[in-house]
From Swiss-Prot:
Record keywords, A-Z: Ribonucleoprotein, Ribosomal protein
Name of the molecule in the record: Small ribosomal subunit protein uS2
Region (Disordered): 230-255
Gene Ontology MF term list: structural constituent of ribosome
UniProt entry tagged with the keyword Ribosomal protein: yes
Pfam families on file: Ribosomal_S2
InterPro entries xref list: Ribosomal_uS2, Ribosomal_uS2_bac/mit/plastid, Ribosomal_uS2_CS, Ribosomal_uS2_flav_dom_sf
Family: Belongs to the universal ribosomal protein uS2 family.
BP-aspect Gene Ontology terms: translation
Species classification: Bacteria, Pseudomonadati, Pseudomonadota, Alphaproteobacteria, Hyphomicrobiales
UniProt-listed Gene3D superfamilies: Glucose-6-phosphate isomerase like protein, domain 1 (3.40.50.10490), Helix hairpin bin (1.10.287.610)
Any single Gene Ontology cellular-component annotation: cytosolic small ribosomal subunit
Length: 255
């Protein structure tokens, strides 16, 4: 295993270089702007490439030492990709809505996760003694909890690293990470504040193909970390009952 490769051409084909309209920019992004075209800022991919490479190394290193990575992306075009990428790399995700206190009030969140597990036990069993209406209410409660917490139910504590799509939309998540000292890898579009992020990656945070490419690369970096961890512990990855699947990067670029 090795860190995933990517090329400038893949970034271009995914539209990573397209920022927002020039009047919407955050002036702090000036160092990462190449120029503008038709009143759209163009992000300097010559900087994106090394910054993305550094972020991938951080993800791999975090997982290699047994750390947990939390993928966060609740916007419509990121939601499904975030969940799939986290699951594929045995990591965790929030893709519905960030609940205030999700990290800073972990004890309360843990209680809700316990409730979700209890509901699973009840509803996966015979659920005897419940009326049809009571069962329906329990199913609705489970569905609501699973939507909010399903991606972190097995995390077992706060993560060691967070990967975020759209820092403006996920500002509460970033604030909580800062309070707890959790480092953040994030995509920073032309309207974002790079100062908030430990490992910023300049790029478009709206285009589905760009989001798919970022998530695929981060996921594969995490898989690389898993392989490194198992190698250092003397485990033979090929002999494992569950070998992480490494999908083709090109599929993400085409998605």
């Amino acid at each position: 295993m090795a860190l995933p490769d990517f090329s400038m051409r893949q970034l271009l084909e995914a539209g990573v270089h397209f920022g927002h309209q020039t009047h919407r920019w955050n002036p702090k992004m000036k160092p990462y702007i190449f120029g503008d075209r038709n009143n759209i800022h163009i992000i300097d991919l010559a900087q994106t490439v090394p910054m993305l490479s550094r972020a991938l190394q951080v993800v791999s290193d975090t997982v290699a030492r047994g750390g947990r990575v939390l993928f966060v992306g609740t916007k419509r075009q990121a939601s499904e990709i975030i969940a799939d990428s986290a699951k594929r790399s045995a990591q965790y995700y929030v893709n519905s809505r960030w609940l205030g206190g999700m990290m800073t009030n972990w004890k309360t969140i843990s209680n809700s996760i316990q409730r979700l597990r209890k509901l699973d036990e009840i509803l996966n069993g015979e659920a005897q003694g419940f009326t049809k209406k009571e069962r329906l209410n329990l199913e609705r409660e489970r569905e609501k909890l699973d939507k909010a917490l399903g991606g972190i139910r097995d995390m077992g504590g706060t993560p060691d690293l967070m990967f975020i799509i759209d820092t403006n939309k996920e500002k509460i998540a970033i604030d909580e990470a800062k309070r707890l000292g959790i480092p953040v890898v994030a995509i920073i579009d032309s309207n974002c504040d790079p100062d908030l992020i430990d490992y910023p990656i300049p790029g478009n945070d709206d285009a589905s193909r760009a989001i798919a490419l970022y998530c695929e690369l981060i996921s594969r970096a995490a898989i690389d970390g898993i392989a490194r961890q198992q190698s250092s512990s003397g485990r033979d990855l090929g002999a494992s009952s569950e070998v992480p699947v490494e999908p083709a990067l090109e599929e993400a670029a085409e998605g």
